[in-house]
């Protein structure tokens, strides 16, 4: 029987995992789907694909195509009876220096006060970034969607200025399946941190220890932070921390990052192992008399002896290099510079092991690790009863991922978000902001007049800087409110469910459900959305998502929509704005179909993702995220937009001889805009002022408003009507929606994929924007709307 045919509510045992893609097969094994593992079918997505299973204490989603490669045996009904937990002692965890166990330590310690650097590593959704915030006081983005940490983040440990820590991306193993796994592994190998802080979710130790064993093989000083211990005890579980510490050979400190409990003790242990270079006391996890007769043990030790000199030269730990060669890791193989005879000898050793063990190399390694983990957990862990968080998540999912309720609920939630943002909360706060800024501008103008300030200087200050920057700042409340809602959806765990629900739809466009989240984040800001594509395991998926994300209307375009829709469609402002969002989505879908059949033609990408429990978003985290976005927006207003406003005012005020012009059509700006205007004339807005506003919008979309404000002297409906009709204003908005978001977004594309793709994205978006705007304009003429 195959996994894709297992009935909901049934249990079965994995017999084998088959796949032509060895990297995908290894990833499936790393996620815990090894032969002998019991799985429970939880549900199918509303459209029948993908499916959700439960194994090793957590939920995993994968597509039916991939599930069909997993053979099952022993199908039976799920055991729902109560579980009786054995008691575990409550021996107090010894303070630093009180314990009897000590890992391998260097003979001389690093001097007090010498710089120390730590790597913070762990699975996704284990509280890693929350711990990073507690350690450093830094306000990073704490989310509950797999892969929220997409770049390197550094901070200094509080009260220890000599100690810094880097928050690495959340990963499940050190196999090079995703870019994040490669980044984390190379950081530890190349930058050689003084110690690793490995954070483990105590509610699912079995799953988290898989990465821990691989980190230990790197033979670096290390301390384990056993997080969420408060949830374990609250749900009837227990962990013998002292025994766990002894079995692993690494210091283990119980903490609760969310409650800031145990952080001080963790820091003390981390500083200690770093200063004394205390490496793990254990690197070998396969017993010489194991169930395979010691075949894997002999294999790894044989390879280690063969490659020891190469590993030392390449600065790669020998044990780690040996296991990676068994896996067939190409990056490690290349780094070791092995000759053909050595490679043949290694392959012979591995083939002999497979014959003796009766299984393939990847399954043998995964079985070895999970077997060791099972023995450890069996001795020192009492699994908690089903947690309240999981019970709550199952109940909520009946609605949010239900067959008939998932998509309607999603539409209601997103509709509510946009309605509250544009029509209720954001609009009310925007009105207050407009009144305040208008009062400031009027007071400044009156003050400068009373002071007798030169008219040109007063025009620069009032008409240029204050009016231009102020017109953009009035949209700050809308942007902050939108980010607040997006943050709540992400931190609660709902974003992951959206990816699960939407996967089948996106697959028709050549994407996976995981692409949905970066594109949804793109409604807030394109830059972090593009950066978050780094979490996607497939290069095909990643590049496609980067190409399409800019079509999702970012919050920086909101001021432009709000201004023109409010001026020309006062009775239908919200519907007009929503229609723009829908156009962006439709164009993105069409572009995806075209790209998937041309530039990015290929096989569908896998969809394998953990579904975290729902959690109440942290008020502090949500508010601080909103503050960070507000701060970024204000900084942009007073830097980029300020500079753009001054430049636009200067070009609009003077002619080529630097004389003040009486007619703006004679200005430097008019000359520059006139060069581009003919290209835009077929779209209905060949006015040089419109083309100038679009050019400055490439710096920052908010600059479109400040430019129009400076050029028109006001942004009232009367002033705007001198340049647009309602119809041409809408076509202008369509072009604004689809052409490149800003220089920062193009820079993010360059950073992620290189200059060639950045140029391609820019050219692609300009072309699509022109074509769609031309179609809308032509259709309007045929319908008599022009």
Predicted feature locations:
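Conserved G1/Walker A P-loop phosphate-binding module
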Residues: 92-173, 191
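Conserved C-terminal guanine-recognition region of P-loop GTPase G domains, centered on the G4
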Residues: 160, 185-252, 560-561, 565
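Alpha-helical transmembrane helix bundles of large polytopic membrane transport and channel proteins
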Residues: 223, 233-385
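Extended, low-charge hydrophobic alpha-helical regions
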Residues: 356, 360-364, 383, 424-465, ...
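Core alpha-helical transmembrane segments of integral membrane proteins
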Residues: 400-500
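Hydrophobic core segments of alpha-helical transmembrane domains in multi-pass membrane transport
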Residues: 409-420, 482-487, 565-567, 581-595, ...
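Juxtamembrane inter-helical linkers in multi-pass membrane proteins
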Residues: 435, 439-443, 496-524, 601-625, ...
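Transmembrane helix-loop junctions at the membrane interface of multipass transporters and ion channels
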Residues: 551, 555-578, 744-754, 775-786
